[in-house]
């Protein structure tokens, strides 16, 4: 009798777990399919830190973003948060990844601008 009850509990649990797993998989697949792929509206850079967060870490604005400003803020914050001065490696790594993320974002935007300018130049009016 106990053997039959134990087998029944195991099969019922496996059935419930199987249904929950398939439902979770369906939801994850639907969520993945509905997310936008890349483009200028992407919120994360190639490095993984969202661009907005990287701007906040380095205290920069999107309007005055340049490699020189990124390098200036990075050098200052990396030095201030050095382990030799009693600060943490964690903060230094956040500053580094923010700088890396913003540089990759600038490279991406430059490439996008160049391809856009190149395609507009080719599609211009032709004179014969």
UniProtKB/Swiss-Prot annotation:
Keywords for the protein's UniProt record, in alphabetical order: Membrane, Mitochondrion, Mitochondrion inner membrane, Protein transport, Translocation, Transport
One Gene Ontology cellular component: PAM complex, Tim23 associated import motor
Transmembrane parts of this sequence: none
InterPro entries in the cross-refs: J_dom_sf, Tim16
BP term (GO), one: protein import into mitochondrial matrix
Pfam families: Pam16 (PF03656)
Molecular function terms, GO-annotated: protein domain specific binding
Function per UniProt: Essential component of the PAM complex, a complex required for the translocation of transit peptide-containing proteins from the inner membrane into the mitochondrial matrix in an ATP-dependent manner. In the complex, it is required to regulate activity of mtHSP70 (SSC1) via its interaction with PAM18/TIM14. May act by positioning PAM18/TIM14 in juxtaposition to mtHSP70 at the translocon to maximize ATPase stimulation.
Entry comment, domain topic: The J-like region, although related to the J domain does not stimulate ATPase activity of mtHSP70. It nevertheless mediates the heterodimerization with the J domain of PAM18 and is therefore essential for PAM complex function.
PANTHER family per record: MITOCHONDRIA ASSOCIATED GRANULOCYTE MACROPHAGE CSF SIGNALING MOLECULE, MITOCHONDRIAL IMPORT INNER MEMBRANE TRANSLOCASE SUBUNIT TIM16
UniProt similarity note: Belongs to the TIM16/PAM16 family.
Protein name: Mitochondrial import inner membrane translocase subunit TIM16
Taxonomic placement: Eukaryota, Fungi, Dikarya, Ascomycota, Saccharomycotina
């Amino acid at each position: 009798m106990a053997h039959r009850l134990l087998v029944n509990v195991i099969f019922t649990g496996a059935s419930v777990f199987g249904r929950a797993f398939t439902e979770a998989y369906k939801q994850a697949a639907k969520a993945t399919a509905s997310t936008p792929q890349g483009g200028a509206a992407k919120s994360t850079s190639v490095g993984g830190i969202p661009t907005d967060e990287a701007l906040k870490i380095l205290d920069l604005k999107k309007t005055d973003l340049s490699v020189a400003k990124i390098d200036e803020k990075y050098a200052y914050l990396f030095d201030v948060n050095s382990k030799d001065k009693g600060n943490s490696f964690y903060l230094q790594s956040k500053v580094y990844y923010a700088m890396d993320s913003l540089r990759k974002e600038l490279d991406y935007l430059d490439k996008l601008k160049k391809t856009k300018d190149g395609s507009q130049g080719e599609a211009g009016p032709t004179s014969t």
